[in-house]
Regions:
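Short amphipathic alpha-helical face segments that pack within enzyme cores
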Residues: 38-41, 77, 99
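DPxDG-like acidic metal-binding loop motif
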Residues: 59-90
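A broad structural signal for alpha-helix termini and local helix breaks/kinks
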Residues: 50, 86-87, 176
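Oxyanion-binding and handling regions
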Residues: 1-20, 32-36, 91-219
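Short glycine-/small-residue-rich flexible loop motifs, especially phosphate/cofactor-binding loops
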Residues: 44, 80, 173
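N-terminal beta-alpha supersecondary unit
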Residues: 1-66
Length: 219
């Protein structure tokens, strides 16, 4: 059975294809806002290269952020379209932060965090906990932190390890306190998004991670 993961990251989108327990590929393409129109072509080209088509994939996992609202919604909408009217095809949304923090390989019971550039000299924090079998699950704790709040927040968590994307490292470290233990990674562990067990395949792709409340405007 084919399974697939689509996870939008700050400077790229990752596509992972598996067949049963075999990882066939982990492909990444630089992609930001205006490049999002390339996503369907990227997915189709990768599937074709491995002798598959969207209809062959029976389990879809979508990275749900945090990230660009436009990118998250596009990935969810595209996946929902490929699943529409197919009772044997299941999908789910799993926070991409799980894949990023999973790069730290937290031990069972260990708390860790993924941190993102929140712009405006702030970082977005997403907490996770290590589980048996190299699994990771969210703790439910999220925060928007400027330098002052970050100093107090991480001061209460001495030694907690943090993961960040390399493309955001400069901006993130400018906000983190000097004692924070952060590691940067070019990519996240998207295979973990497929194999994590905390989130069932419920066909609900409408739960993007909004750590910072969405801003609405009116005319």
């Amino acid at each position: 059975m084919y399974r697939a993961v689509i996870d939008p990251a700050p400077d790229h989108t990752a596509f992972t294809l598996l067949r049963d327990d075999e990882v066939l590929c982990v492909e990444r393409r630089p992609m930001r806002g205006r490049d999002a129109a390339e996503l369907p072509v990227f997915i189709l080209e990768t599937l074709t290269a491995h002798g598959a088509a969207p209809g062959d994939v029976k389990r879809w996992t979508v990275g749900s952020g945090p990230g660009s609202f436009t990118g998250l919604r596009l990935v969810a909408a595209l996946t929902a379209a490929w699943c529409l009217g197919k009772p044997d095809v299941l999908s789910r949304a799993v926070p991409g932060a799980v894949a990023l923090a999973g790069m730290l390989r937290p031990a069972p019971g260990e708390k860790a965090g993924a941190v993102y550039d929140g712009r405006n000299k702030e970082v977005l924090y997403f907490g996770v906990e290590g589980m048996p079998g190299n699994d990771v699950r969210p703790t439910g704790e999220t925060a928007v932190l400027d330098r002052e709040r970050a100093a107090a927040f991480f001061g209460d968590r001495p030694g907690e390890r943090l993961a960040m994307f390399s493309c955001e490292e400069t901006a993130v470290r400018a906000v983190l306190p000097p004692g924070a233990t952060g590691e940067s990674f070019a990519y996240s562990d998207t295979v973990l998004l497929d194999r994590t067990s905390f989130q069932p395949f419920d066909n609900d792709l409408t739960r993007p991670v909004y750590i910072r409340p969405a801003v609405y405007t009116s005319n």
